[in-house]
Amino acid sequence: MKLTCMMLVAVLFLTAWTFVTANVSRNGLENLFPEERHEMMNPNAAKLNNRDCVKAGTACGFPKPEPACCSSWCIFVCT
């Protein structure tokens, strides 16, 4: 009984927290993460996609450990 009551209070609290922290409280669940949704629709907009990597055919390996190959396969040259 106590566990059920605690779970109910926790769910109500988390639901209220979602609406309070939303940008627009009227459409709280729709506008909760607008920037991330934009990055999912346009992957080129994500900052993590802008990484430094070496293209195929370029030397890589022991004397030159970084930047990594774009394909992540290095056998003396990026493949």
Swiss-Prot record:
Locations listed in the record: Secreted
Tissue: Expressed by the venom duct.
Free-text domain note: The presence of a 'disulfide through disulfide knot' structurally defines this protein as a knottin.
Principal location listed in the UniProt entry: secreted
Alphabetized UniProt keyword annotations: Disulfide bond, Knottin, Neurotoxin, Secreted, Signal, Toxin
Organism expressing this protein natively: Conus leopardus
Pfam families: Conotoxin
Signal sequence interval, chain numbering: 1-22
InterPro entries: Conotoxin (IPR004214)
Keyword Signal in record: yes
Protein name: Conotoxin Leo-O4
Protein family according to the UniProt entry: Belongs to the conotoxin O1 superfamily.
GO cellular component annotations of the record: extracellular region
GO terms assigned for molecular function: ion channel inhibitor activity; toxin activity
Disulphide bonds in the chain: C53-C70, C60-C74, C69-C78
Secreted recorded as keyword: yes
